[in-house]
Amino acid sequence: MSKASKQTTYRVDGMSCTNCAGKFEKNVKNLEGVTDAKVNFGAGKISVYGETSISQIEKAGAFENLRVTDEKDYSSKPAKKESFLKKNWHLVVSIIFIILAFISQNISGEDSTTTIILYVIAIVVGGFNLFKEGFANLIKLDFTMESLMTIAIIGASIIGEWAEGSIVVILFAFSEVLERYSMDKARQSIRSLMDIAPKEALIRRDDVEQMIAVSDIQIGDIMIIKPGQKIAMDGVVIKGYSAINQSAITGESIPVEKKVDDEVFAGTLNEEGLLEVKVTKHVEDTTISKIIHLVEEAQGERAPAQAFVDKFAKYYTPTIMLIALLVVVVPPLFFGGDWDTWVYQGLSLLVVGCPCSLVISTPVSIVSAIGNSAKNGVLVKGGIYLEEIGGLQAIAFDKTGTLTKGKPVVTDFIPYSEHMDEQNSLSIITALETMSQHPLASAIISKAMIDNVDYKSIEIDNFSSITGKGVKGEVNGITYYIGSSKLFESSLEKSQSISQTYQSLQKQGKTAMLFGTESNILAIIAVADEVRESSKEVIAQLHKLGIAHTIMLTGDNNDTAQFIGKEIGVSDIKAELMPEDKLTYIKELKQTYGKVAMIGDGVNDAPALAASTVGIAMGGAGTDTALETADVALMGDDLKKLPFIVNLSRKTLKIIKQNITFSLGIKLLALLLVLPGWLTLWIAIVADMGATLLVTLNGLRLMKVKK
């Protein structure tokens, strides 16, 4: 590989905005020895092509005090946290001076020297970084959002509207704080993925067992996993039998039985037996490593949508300035107009053209809507996501923990014995399960406790596990069995009705177990992941809102998925999916429908959440990674909040359009008043301030939208 084509990836701490990331990328590209560079803002990474040093890269990011670390040496431990006050002192100080200015204004008046000085300090402190960027862009005639905000604040200051200027500064500074917080949390969640799998494993080499770091484990090594341990590497079982909790990887709610030749994944939990596993992948190729990579790549692909106002400013602001200049010079030079009159008209046009109402029209609506959604238990991580929800054409749901409760419970108990009632049967079943360490034992024990079944007094003798079938034990000299149909093949052949019931429960996506003696089946007990009571109602509401495409995605088997999907009423069902399958399907949905949301709660959902137009997590049941990777979190595990946020988003979009239309309409009307020379500074101020006030009040209406 040539030096020019050599690629090195570095972790970057301190990137707080997309503009900073773009500037950093440009600076690195200009370094000697670097042929190209690409920043992944979402993951906090930069890929550098060519050869350079970390010190040189850090110099390229010195304007933001960026800290750079080679990804190979990067620690998964979170960086030392700075306090909110330390990181955002400029915002806090600015707010304090605005409060002091309000007090001074009420005592001494808005034109008093003290009031003006306090407002000036608030504007300078809160908007210092904004002004630096804004003026730099204006010098280059690059009319970005920063330059638009700078002109808005200066315009407000020139006409003496110090309060308005300071509020605009605060709104912009606060939006930057939210952006930085969201990105910091997202990066922390990605780092936490690295801690799912152990950093070392017990490996047998040449009949010697030793702990070896995962980076030194080779394909073909024999890994020994004891009960209760997490699996460090992907591999295939060569000896042993166990139940593996792999919900963090595949999303399956119920631990999966693993036997010889079955595949196991790094980061999953061995709950029951001793396993020997042959390693099949290097650490960088494991399933969990792929998930981390997919999350970071998906985050990097999502470019921040440029708001309409930011795009419009490139044409609006210079156009207003040009028109004002023409108003000042054309009438006096070519038509003999009075200079004083037309300078006044030009100044009035600049005042009415001040984009304050235009600038505020969107953020006031977004802030109000986000505040309302938070009060109603929906956390939205940015205005762009709130806007995107309003245009959703399809929503994909993870099954486990989202449409279902994510916790197995006993759904059916069917007794068949005339001599043993349900209480006695359940007491023996529970006593056996407490000794078995079966993955579903917790569901049976919970039912026994709810039904006040006395199972602790049952004495079990000669207990033993029957590998791959179930367990058995003696109670008062009678041997009882509980397990799969393999334990009762002869009894099932004799009873067609019991066999049909058992098969029917299995087809419903439930895990059915038989309880009985060597000669008779005494009961069937079925366990399943319960559907949330609200799921069917929520899907119906979404269909009424016009979102016709609702898709259930799951790692569970097809029978379970089909039964639950039809019960809930989703329009499509996709089962037996791995994380990469979910990601691929989300990308396909985006190509078909445009704007697509993904709702999930597990680590396996993280790539799909990141790749969707809007990633939505179930708060409470959701893992930290899903919550932080997602753009929206439904707190309290309440799926019913989904139709609310869709409705709120649509109303937000409607009000934003109203505000922008009204703001521009007022300015157009004022422009028409220039032609006959009727525009006065008083009319300009009233029009500008009136528009600002009205769009603000209109935006605040979003605080009142209810569920």
Curated annotation (Swiss-Prot):
Protein name as catalogued: Probable cadmium-transporting ATPase
Record carries keyword Hydrolase: no
Listed GO biological process terms: metal ion transport; response to cadmium ion; transmembrane transport
PROSITE patterns reported for this sequence: ATPASE_E1_E2 (PS00154), HMA_1 (PS01047), HMA_2 (PS50846)
Chief subcellular location: membrane
Catalytic residues (UniProt): D398
Pfam families: E1-E2_ATPase, HMA, Hydrolase
